[in-house]
Amino acid sequence: MAQRQKPMALRPAARILFLPPLNRPSPFNPWLARLLPPPPPGKLTKLTPGSSKILSSAPLVSFPSRLETPQVKYCLIWPSGQGLTPTLPTSQPCTPAGLGTWRFSWSSPAMPLLLARWLLPLYHPIFPRGHSLLPRSHASHMSCVMCAPWSPFNSLFLMCVESFGMLPRIKRNLCAWFACCTRHSAQTARVMSLLWSLAAFFLSRRLISILST
């Protein structure tokens, strides 16, 4: 009887981080210097329209907010495959050829995802658009509130959940559902933000009481 092989962990094809124009002030600028890891070794090259193949294997779930229009985004793309070179931030329009285009600006409530992206570098599968049975790599963690919270308080919530050992058990079941909700409705994202913030408040109080006893 042949032994069943364990499924290999899905690894992202690229790490994608959206940056603002450097001349635009933002309250999150101090976080950039603290959270951005050093660039990987290799030759730095600018992103050109010909490098779209690097983006093609990075599925992103779109967030169709009617209040914001797609803008030219600054992208920092670090391919993880061998033989590929990292990429400098550039003002090229980023249109990933995966599940859709991630739309946001610095005024978007989605900005705290930058904080969670580097504090909680989780890699796990999500179900792509169409509810396919084949999971795809959640490359940039920008489509799910479990990985990319919509409120600064949510990073505290995720830390509390992880400290209680619940994160590995619940993230696989909730991630695809939250990604689906936030993809279809901006209002749903705001509601989820409020719910996660309340959960973060109560979990943080419980964690403090446990540590103080």
UniProtKB/Swiss-Prot annotation:
Protein keywords:
Host mitochondrion, Host-virus interaction, Inhibition of host innate immune response by virus, Viral immunoevasion
Q: What is this protein called?
A: Virulence factor 1
Q: Which GO terms describe its biological process?
A: symbiont-mediated suppression of host innate immune response
| Broad class of where this protein is predominantly found | host cell
Q: Which species is this UniProt entry from?
A: Norovirus (isolate Mouse/NoV/United States/MNV1/2002/GV)
Superkingdom of origin: Viruses
Q: What induces it?
A: expressed as early as 9 hpi.
> Where is the protein situated, by its record's location annotation?
Host mitochondrion
The record makes one more remark, namely: This ORF is not present in other Noroviruses.
Q: Name one GO cellular component term.
A: host cell mitochondrion
| Chain's role | Plays a role in antagonizing the host innate immune response.
